[in-house]
A protein has these predicted regions:
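Short glycine-/acidic-enriched loop or helix-start segments at secondary-structure transitions
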Residues: 16-17, 42
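Gly/Ala-rich phosphate-binding loop of Rossmann-like dinucleotide-binding domains
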Residues: 17, 21-24
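A generic structural signal for short, solvent-exposed coil/turn residues
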Residues: 8, 24, 61-62
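A generic structural motif
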Residues: 25-30
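Conserved N-terminal/central alpha/beta ligand/cofactor-binding core
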Residues: 35-119
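Conserved structural-core and active-site-/substrate-pathway-adjacent residues in large, well-folded domains
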Residues: 6-8, 16, 74
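Beta1/beta-strand and adjacent pyrophosphate-binding region of the FAD-binding site
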Residues: 1-12, 31-33
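Hydrophobic alpha-helical segments
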Residues: 13-14, 64
Length: 119
């Protein structure tokens, strides 16, 4: 029996589980369900064929634990001025606070602290 089932182990699912475990007032038994493969079993046929073969039932690059970010170069936009409409919805200061909070979590789990592209 689980207190909560999270569908999707991309960044949103992973961060949701982490926040619930860290900030929950009671212990949570959480099931994180993902239709893709674990990171260590995600291999793209394009590496051998040179072309996308439209994997079925799911793409090994975009689906699986950590989502497409598992194979990204790790770039994050660390300014509310880059991206969508979040600052319009919650304000610039709060948007930046959330971005900084998220960056600290990534750093806690081993992200490279070097920041590039700052102007």
């Amino acid at each position: 029996m689980y207190d909560l089932i999270i569908v999707g182990a991309g960044p949103a699912g992973i961060f949701t589980a982490l926040e619930l475990l860290r900030k929950g007032s009671t212990p949570h038994k959480i099931l994180l369900v993902e239709k893709g493969k674990p990171v260590e079993k995600r291999h793209c046929p394009k590496d051998k064929t040179g072309v996308c073969v439209n994997c079925k039932p799911t793409c090994a690059i975009t689906t699986g634990f950590s989502g497409a970010g598992a194979f990204s170069d790790g770039k994050l936009s660390l300014s509310y001025q880059v991206g969508g409409e979040l600052p319009d919805l919650i304000g610039e200061d709060f948007a930046q606070e959330l971005i900084d909070y998220t960056d600290k979590i990534y750093l806690e789990f081993g992200a490279d602290p070097k920041v590039e592209g700052v102007y």
